[in-house]
Structures are given as C-alpha cells and as structure tokens.
C-alpha cells in the first residue's frame, strides 16, 4: 500500500484520503504520518461503517480469503464504492454475487489489475479495437520472474516482529493433489486479464497443471529454518474460448527473468 495505493490516492485531486487502517497499530500510525493522512485506526469494520466515507480500498494480504472477501462484502453492504486487490474471493461464484450486489446498489467496483493501463498494453488494446490486427484467434501469455527463486525468501512477504501463530499456514499438506495456488493467482491474473481483453472472448474449457519446484523454503521472515510448503510456484494451462479461439498461459516466480516479466502475444 505504501508504494502504490496510498501515493496514488494522495496525488489525486479527485479525492481526500482521510483514514488509513492496519492491524499493526505502529504501521498504521507511521503511514498516516508519512503521507499526511489525518486519521488512522486498527478496526477495519468500524472504519468501513463510517457514514462520511465514500470509497474503501482493500489492499490487505490475503492468503485464504480471510480479508478481501469479508471486507469487500461489508463495504458494499454499507454502500461504499470498492477498489480491492486480487483475489476478490476464493470462489468465483462469490465474486459474481458481490458484483450483483454492487450493481443492485449502483456502486462502482474495481479489481487492482493495473498492468492493463501500461502504455504498451493500452496501445495493443487500441489496435485490437480498431481492427488493425484482424480476428483474434490465439493468445499466448506468460509472466515469470525470480522473486521466490531463493528458498530463504519467505513464502509470506509480510514483515513480522514475532511468530504469527494465529495465521493459517499455506501448503501444509504435501499431497500433490492438495497443492495451493500461488503463482497462478498472484502472477497469472494480470496477464490473464490482458489476454481476455485482447482475444475478446470468454474461456469455455481449460486444463491446467500446477507444480511445486522449490519444495522447501522459509515460511515467515522470523523463521530460522526452511520447511515443506506445497505451493504453486509454476503452472501452465491451455483453454478453448467460446468463439473457438485458443488461450495459453504459463506463470512462475522461481525462474530467471525480468520483473514482472510479462509476455502477451495475440
């Protein structure tokens, strides 16, 4: 939030950023002082229920749907416009329900898939919309980098002062059939978003495989050891589109490449 969300709100002359909420009291206070925000708090529900707020920006860490979905739901129920980071929810049906709720209340919603606004991507979109490329039949995309190549880099990027015993752990079950989503959601989503816009169609059928190439790593920054974490750090999928086109996607954050290393070919 301190590198993207908050600076963006502060720079905009279309709004007033009035309150920052974080479960870490010291961090909430520090960010408010850093960006000149008049208020800070640690109670998200109380803040969302305030009648003087129009927009809620949900940019919390979300491993198992423990924050994005409930905070977004509450904000919409309270009549707030919502910007939320991915994933909105762990079940796509809940996303559709929240979309319907927002529309029923005349509320604006946005998922933080911002790579689509890069000048190069916008130029690609313009070419497609103007018909200069022709009928889009095939999309190939990948997003890969080496952010988690080093197993000493913690699976959870948050900086903890003490061990977070209250958190549900990712990837505790070593069974390959129980692998938990990581790269596909975190790094695939922005490129999938770009691909769907370019191919101008919806996915009909797909087959996907996820792999755990670096099986042991540190879980938290406070750990002094590595452990088995069954977590998707590389994946591939191919799909049929409803109008007959084909769509392929590959992501990984344990490969040597640029950051963020996005490739989109239509």
Predicted regions and their residues:
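NAD(P)-dinucleotide binding in Rossmann-like oxidoreductases
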Residues: 227-234, 242-266
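Beta-strand-loop-alpha-helix segment that lines the small-molecule cofactor/substrate pocket
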Residues: 55, 63-117, 131
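Short, Asp-centered acidic motifs that coordinate Mg2+ and/or phosphate
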Residues: 19, 39, 55, 138
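Short, conserved SAM-binding/catalytic segment
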Residues: 31-37, 97, 101-102
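N-terminal Rossmann-like dinucleotide-binding module
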Residues: 1-35
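Conserved SAM-binding strand-loop segment of SAM-dependent methyltransferases
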Residues: 37-44
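Predominantly a Rossmann-like dinucleotide-binding segment in NAD(P)-dependent oxidoreductases
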Residues: 1, 118-228
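Short glycine-/small-residue-rich Rossmann-like dinucleotide-binding loops
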Residues: 52, 59-64, 251
């Amino acid at each position: 939030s301190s590198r993207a969300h908050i600076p963006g709100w502060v720079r905009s002359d279309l709004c007033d950023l009035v309150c920052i909420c974080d479960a870490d009291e010291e961090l909430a206070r520090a960010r408010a002082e850093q960006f000149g925000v008049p208020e800070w708090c640690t109670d998200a529900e109380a803040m969302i229920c305030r009648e003087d707020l129009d927009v809620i920006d949900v940019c919390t860490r979300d491993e198992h749907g423990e924050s994005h979905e409930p905070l977004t739901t509450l904000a919409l129920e309270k009549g707030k416009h919502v910007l939320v980071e991915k994933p909105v929810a762990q079940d796509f049906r809940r996303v559709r329900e929240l979309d319907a709720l927002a529309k029923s209340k005349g509320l604006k919603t946005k998922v933080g898939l911002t790579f689509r606004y890069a000048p190069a991507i916008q130029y690609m979109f313009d070419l497609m919309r103007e018909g200069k490329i022709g009928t889009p039949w095939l999309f190939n995309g990948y997003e890969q980098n080496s952010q988690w190549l080093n197993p000493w880099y913690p699976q959870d990027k948050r900086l903890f002062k003490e061990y977070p015993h209250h958190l549900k752990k990712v990837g505790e079950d070593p069974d390959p059939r129980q692998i938990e989503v990581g790269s596909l959601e975190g790094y695939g989503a922005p490129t999938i978003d770009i691909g769907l816009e370019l191919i101008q169609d919806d996915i009909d059928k797909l087959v996907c495989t996820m792999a755990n190439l670096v099986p042991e790593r540190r879980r938290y920054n406070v750990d002094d050891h590595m452990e088995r974490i069954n977590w998707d750090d590389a994946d591939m999928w191919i799909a049929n589109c409803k109008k007959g086109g084909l769509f392929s996607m590959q992501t990984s954050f344990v490969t040597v490449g640029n950051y963020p290393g996005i490739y989109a070919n239509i």
